[in-house]
From Swiss-Prot:
Family statement drawn from the similarity comment of this UniProt entry: Belongs to the Ahb/Nir family.
Domain of life (superkingdom): Bacteria
Catalytic activity of the protein: siroheme + 2 H(+) = 12,18-didecarboxysiroheme + 2 CO2
Protein name, entry field: Siroheme decarboxylase NirD subunit
Inactivation phenotype: Insertional mutagenesis results in the loss of respiratory nitrite reductase activity in vivo and in vitro. Mutant strains synthesize a periplasmic cytochrome cd1 that lacks heme d1.
Length: 152
């Protein structure tokens, strides 16, 4: 995937937050020295190319409810079926296949710990697999950004 100069500047500047105003794309364009149409076209292209999955807020989950990292040891023959079932839960995000006995890893979120516990029990009942529940005890550093900078 080719990332042009405008895309790099756009990602570097706004991956940690967008302008909170009535016309955020226009404000972004003004700051970047281009048109609103160029910003929108750039974002569309990034999404089409698979370089951008979504535009939206990221919430501090510990203030809004509960979450946990979950791992399942899924037999290879059942991976697609189990992954599809896990993905059907709206509370699931970041579902990844890993090379390990515990090979399916995902994050569960909910309004409180009781909800998480109920989801874990439902996942176990639905799949016959015992979830490994790994709640975060302390965040040392969380930065979901990846600075691209100038490639030259």
């Amino acid at each position: 995937m080719h990332i042009d100069a405008l895309s790099r500047r756009l990602i570097d500047r706004y991956q940690h937050g967008m302008p909170l105003c009535a016309e955020p794309y226009r404000a972004m364009a003004e700051e970047l020295g281009c048109s609103e149409g160029e910003v929108l076209a750039c974002l569309e292209q990034l999404q089409e190319d698979g370089g951008l999955s979504r535009i939206g807020p990221v919430f501090e989950h510990s203030r809004a409810g509960a979450s946990t990292l979950v791992a399942l040891a899924v037999p290879e023959a059942r991976l697609e079926q189990v992954a599809a079932r896990i993905n059907a839960f709206p509370e699931v995000n970041h579902n990844y296949l890993r090379e390990h006995r515990y090979n399916l890893w995902f994050v569960l979120t909910g309004p409180d710990r009781a909800h998480i516990d109920a989801l874990l029990a439902e996942i176990e009942a639905d799949t016959g697999l015992v979830p490994l529940d790994l709640p975060m005890l302390h965040a040392f550093r969380i930065d979901l950004g990846f600075p691209l900078g100038d490639p030259s």
